[in-house]
Structures are given as C-alpha cells and as structure tokens.
Amino acid sequence: RVKYRKVFPNQPFEVLEMDIKFVWVEEYKMHCYVLTTIDTFTRIVLHWMVAYSIKKQDVKRAWEHIIINHLQPNNCLEKGINIEVRNDNDSRFSAKLIQEFFKENYLNQVFTHPYTPQENGHIESFHAILAKKLCPFTFWSIDELEGVLTLFYEKYNNERLHS
C-alpha cells in the first residue's frame, strides 16, 4: 500500500503511475480501454495502448516496452533508481503475473488505497485532461479513436510545457 498520499520524485523514473480509462465507441456499442503510464517527474507518457479488452498479458507487454525503451536506455538499475509503480487495485494490475514480473525487473509496485485518486494524482489528472479533449467527439470505430489518441499523446509529450 501507498505510504504517502502525494509523491515528490527527485528525478525521472522514480515514480511511475498507470491507470485505465474507458472511452465509448459506437461501432460495437461498447467501451474501449485506454491504458496509460506516466512518469510523475517529467509528466511524460511512457506508454499507452487502446483496445476493446486489456488483459494482464497486455499490461506485461506494456511494461516490457517501458523497460526496453525507457528504463534500460536511461540505465536506471546502474544509477540505483528505486522505481515505484503506483496503480489502483484493478485485477489486471494485481495479477500474480504482473506482481512477479515487477519483482523480476526491480520495479516496486505500490497499490493505492480504495477511493483515494489523489494517491495516483498525476495519472488521474492526465486522464481528466484526456477526457476533456475527447468529450466533443463521437468515435465510430476504435481506429478513429486510436487516431485521435495518437495525435493527443504526441502533442502532450512533445509540444506542451511539462511542469
């Protein structure tokens, strides 16, 4: 469980947060899931994906991507960065497969307390920004949603000022 309600990381990759957002798609009259992982120090989105179904194996693949493309190139292990991964109690995050994968890769998974979005505040805030951006749209297909998300994430990571 989370020790501190708010996080104050001192460097990139110290505290990472992940969460899943739901977005309605008309094609099959159902929600799509958007999985996002953010670095709380830089506010950069390290990985995102959208699908009609996200399973624990998808979460693992997302973290394999983060490790290969972000953590390893920045020598996080060699630098001795104690990486904390904050997430809620979603069954995909609490699955034994994910917990073991995190341990094997020196990632310290921390679960937020129920009904305390402030403990995962950066990703919750990010998903609120995303919701506001997506609000005016009606998505007819997952491809249409993915196109809008691709532009949004690129602009968010590359054009906005990160505090």
Language-model segments: what does each one mean?
Residues R1-I38, I44, Q57-H65, N69-N74:
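Mobile-element integrase/transposase regions
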Residues I20, T40, N89, N158:
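Residues immediately flanking
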Residues W48-M49:
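Short hydrophobic alpha-helix segments
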Residues W63, N75-S94, P117-N120:
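Acidic/histidine-rich, metal-coordinating catalytic segments
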